[in-house]
């Protein structure tokens, strides 16, 4: 996650964008910073149902009990949304993930009101899947 900003810097950078075109470009840029997902991780068990695009999210727990997320999508904007979600959950334990509400962050960014309904549903599906995977680990 060293290539991605922390939550506060994400919000600052997002709010600095002059308009929604710049914000979409920033989201896409964040997606381009995600590490490449291995082919073997593009499996049905890592596939997120409820997304219009193909989305894969892998969750592992490191030796310190912190979750590590990896993901990819076949759509640039969705890959960027994956990066945004990963930033919000960075350095958390599985229990932290289960308890953390991302909605206030999305509201500060005015994110969901500028996404199409299908993208918003896909974003919710990603969050549900991450929380379910975290609950299984906690």
Curated annotation (Swiss-Prot):
<comment type="pathway">
    <text>Cofactor biosynthesis; iron-sulfur cluster biosynthesis.</text>
</comment>
<dbReference type="GO" id="GO:0005737">
    <property type="term" value="C:cytoplasm"/>
</dbReference>
<comment type="subunit">
    <text>Homodimer. Interacts with SufS.</text>
</comment>
<dbReference type="InterPro" id="IPR023939">
    <property type="entry name" value="Cysteine_desulfuration_SufE"/>
</dbReference>
<comment type="function">
    <text>Participates in cysteine desulfuration mediated by SufS. Cysteine desulfuration mobilizes sulfur from L-cysteine to yield L-alanine and constitutes an essential step in sulfur metabolism for biosynthesis of a variety of sulfur-containing biomolecules. Functions as a sulfur acceptor for SufS, by mediating the direct transfer of the sulfur atom from the S-sulfanylcysteine of SufS, an intermediate product of cysteine desulfuration process.</text>
</comment>
<dbReference type="Pfam" id="PF02657">
    <property type="entry name" value="SufE"/>
</dbReference>
<comment type="similarity">
    <text>Belongs to the SufE family.</text>
</comment>
<protein>
    <recommendedName>
        <fullName>Cysteine desulfuration protein SufE</fullName>
    </recommendedName>
</protein>
<dbReference type="GO" id="GO:0006790">
    <property type="term" value="P:sulfur compound metabolic process"/>
</dbReference>
<keyword id="KW-0963">Cytoplasm</keyword>
<dbReference type="GO" id="GO:0016226">
    <property type="term" value="P:iron-sulfur cluster assembly"/>
</dbReference>
<feature type="active site" description="Cysteine persulfide intermediate">
    <location>
        <position position="51"/>
    </location>
</feature>
<dbReference type="InterPro" id="IPR003808">
    <property type="entry name" value="Fe-S_metab-assoc_dom"/>
</dbReference>
């Amino acid at each position: 996650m060293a290539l991605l900003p922390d939550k506060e810097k994400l919000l600052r950078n997002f709010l600095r964008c002059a308009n929604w075109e710049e914000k979409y470009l920033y989201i896409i840029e964040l997606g381009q910073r995600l590490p490449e997902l291995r082919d073997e991780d593009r499996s049905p068990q890592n596939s997120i149902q409820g997304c219009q695009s193909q989305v894969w999210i892998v969750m592992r727990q490191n030796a310190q009990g912190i979750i590590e997320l990896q993901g990819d999508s076949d759509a640039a904007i969705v890959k960027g949304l994956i990066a945004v979600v990963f930033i919000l959950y960075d350095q958390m334990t599985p229990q932290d993930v289960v308890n953390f509400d991302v909605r206030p962050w999305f509201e500060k960014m005015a994110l969901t009101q500028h996404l199409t309904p299908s993208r918003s549903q896909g974003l919710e599906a990603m969050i549900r899947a991450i929380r379910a995977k975290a609950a299984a680990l906690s």
